[in-house]
Amino acid sequence: MAALRQPQVAELLAEARRAFREEFGAEPELAVSAPGRVNLIGEHTDYNQGLVLPMALELMTVLVGSPRKDGLVSLLTTSEGADEPQRLQFPLPTAQRSLEPGTPRWANYVKGVIQYYPAAPLPGFSAVVVSSVPLGGGLSSSASLEVATYTFLQQLCPDSGTIAARAQVCQQAEHSFAGMPCGIMDQFISLMGQKGHALLIDCRSLETSLVPLSDPKLAVLITNSNVRHSLASSEYPVRRRQCEEVARALGKESLREVQLEELEAARDLVSKEGFRRARHVVGEIRRTAQAAAALRRGDYRAFGRLMVESHRSLRDDYEVSCPELDQLVEAALAVPGVYGSRMTGGGFGGCTVTLLEASAAPHAMRHIQEHYGGTATFYLSQAADGAKVLCL
């Protein structure tokens, strides 16, 4: 059992250029890339103004294209799993006519970024999207596409915004055009990732801190359950609303301002379910701070213990895990050399992330597959750089 080979940026770029030539009859003039991400710890805390600790992945979206003079946007994707149609054309938004979300769903992420892009005037353009980020796997294929789109638009019409402002435009696109009230972590790490580092993000102040993650004896294993339960999209807004209700009941702007002791003392002010949801978030923010400190001092065992605590809290208090994810985590934890494992992403399917000794990775993948009822896909990734302009 081996990890799925990840196409390198040169391969994705070659595929995108080939598709562009076939579709538009010319070479593209511009090319950009933006990575997916895995969140090592800090789950469902970003929209509660908490702490998160993601790293950018070597899985990425590549977008190539050229400006055009007719005010139209013409798009093609070759991404596996993207809904039909894989090509479409639409006019740029105007003061009188905004873009609207529709079908195909994959194009809504592009449309949203175009709609909220702050600089003008944008020309029309033709573009091809190629991605190695699995769709629906909890590795931020959506943020990767949003950030790639934003980075491409910058080449057509430069902006003057901060990185935080760029992340917020991409986040707004996902809120309004994909109907997902996500936090800002995914867009931030796709923009700001740095090779050999995880990124501790404070989602209240938007301050960031690089945390070294380049020990060659250490590996990060991502395991895709290849299941996606329908609860994923419907339950996410429910969890967010429950957290906001508890914060209001405690007279706080967000759960970031709540300590566990305060929450315990106010147990009677909130529903039992609301209390459990908030207990996860408040505890997870604390765990994330502790995990970043553990990683800085090279204490992988402490980091792993916090990952396991995080998973159990997501399973029992936040109730966003599922039997498949639990099975993957338990199988990983049975392998010598594994420090910790947890579900990552929104939940109800998608991926787990496991921190382990690099030498243990082959055995871990075999053991997990043997003890998993479904078919898992494995990715071994180093911490990668954020969005880039590529040379053609």
Curated annotation (Swiss-Prot):
Enzyme class: transferase
Residue(s) carrying Phosphoserine: 230
UniProt binding sites for alpha-D-galactose: 37, 43-44, 46, 186, 236
Record keywords: ATP-binding, Carbohydrate metabolism, Cataract, Disease variant, Galactose metabolism, Kinase, Nucleotide-binding, Phosphoprotein, Transferase
Protein name: Galactokinase
Disease as annotated in the protein's UniProt record: Galactosemia 2: A form of galactosemia, an inborn error of galactose metabolism typically manifesting in the neonatal period, after ingestion of galactose, with jaundice, hepatosplenomegaly, hepatocellular insufficiency, food intolerance, hypoglycemia, renal tubular dysfunction, muscle hypotonia, sepsis and cataract. GALAC2 inheritance is autosomal recessive.
Swiss-Prot/TrEMBL GO biological process terms: galactitol metabolic process; galactose catabolic process via UDP-galactose, Leloir pathway; galactose metabolic process; glycolytic process from galactose
Catalysed transformations (reactions): alpha-D-galactose + ATP = alpha-D-galactose 1-phosphate + ADP + H(+)
Regions crossing the membrane: none
Coiled-coil spans in chain: none
Lineage, top ranks: Eukaryota, Metazoa, Chordata, Craniata, Vertebrata
Chain positions recorded as ATP binding sites: 136, 138, 140-141
Biochemical pathway: Carbohydrate metabolism; galactose metabolism
Sequence similarity: Belongs to the GHMP kinase family. GalK subfamily.
Active-site residues, record numbering mapped to chain: 186
